[in-house]
Amino acid sequence: WLSEQIASLAAGAAINRYPDADPRSLKDIIRTVIDLPRDLDILLGNGSDEIIQLLALATAKQNAVLLSVEPSFVMYKMVAAFTGMQYVGVPLANDFTLDVPALLAAIEQQQPALMFLSYPNNPSGNLFDAQAMARIIEAAPGLVVVDEAYYNFAGSSFLPMIKRHPNLLVMRTFSKLGMAGLRLGFLAGSKTWLGQLEKLRLPYNISVLTQLVAKQLLRSHDVLQSQAEQIKRDRVMVYERLEAIDGVQPYPSAANFILFRVRYAGKIFQGLKERGVLIKDLSRAHPLLSDCLRVTIGTPQENECFVQALQESVRQCV
């Protein structure tokens, strides 16, 4: 029934008109869904990628540093290059947890204008220790953006911490809730910061169709969240199935995917592909990801096909 409602909205959309340049009604629905206090504000972006670029543009003075951890979301490094910022990546520990001493030392030495921390982290899927995150936010001289793209699969958020840390902003996207094609993300934070960032936001960056469809979907947020809850249950099942395969080491995940390490990852990836299953080969993306592959949780049928194909591929490579 949601598909029918969306089709009806699209059919009646005034696409001959410019979109609302500051869609307050959409912001209000988002504010209600995330229970954001009135003294904080929201900035909308054409996906979180646009917001990452906007933040970099706002802080990209000469020799300004953008700092993040590695491995993490590749867009942080890419946007630093696009905007002329110096990128500094601090490696995570071998178990993908934060290396707090190394991060604090990098902050002290580099004095970053902008920091990104993915929570849960992409591609490892784990939630960093909240107390360690707080120490890093307090030590940072510039803006710290907590990227909560996978919040709906984790349930843990830094939104309540914004008032405690004046340099903290929280970013989310609706892509992981089945709205990737709409390209809609948002940044939450103090009105002071967002008021300045709004000056750099391009007008009409959220299309007429995106505004209409997003509002309709967010009015049915309970349906979307129930889908996320199902993915969380399926994630447990897939993790347990992976644990049971000799030679496969899955990593605990709070996202909608699972990272796992397996010998001959390249051959396993090809074996899966030959069996009609396409996942992400991260084995050459970063030294810490050696022999790592990442699978997104799908439908129960897709998950079963993946597990069976993986079992066959592992047996073939032994």
Question: What spans do the regions from the language model cover?
Answer:
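N-terminal small-domain helix-loop-helix segment of the aminotransferase-like
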Residues: W1-D49, L54
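PLP-dependent aminotransferase-like
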Residues: N16, A58-L117
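Short beta->alpha connector loops at strand-helix junctions that form conserved
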Residues: E70, G89-N94, E148, R172, ...
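Active-site phosphate-binding strand-loop segment of PLP-dependent enzymes
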Residues: N94-E148, N152
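PLP-dependent aminotransferase class I/II
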Residues: N167-A244, Q249-P250
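Conserved PLP-binding catalytic core of the aspartate aminotransferase-like
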Residues: I231-K232, V236, L242-R275
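PLP-dependent enzyme catalytic core of the Aspartate aminotransferase-like
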Residues: E274-R275, R284-V318
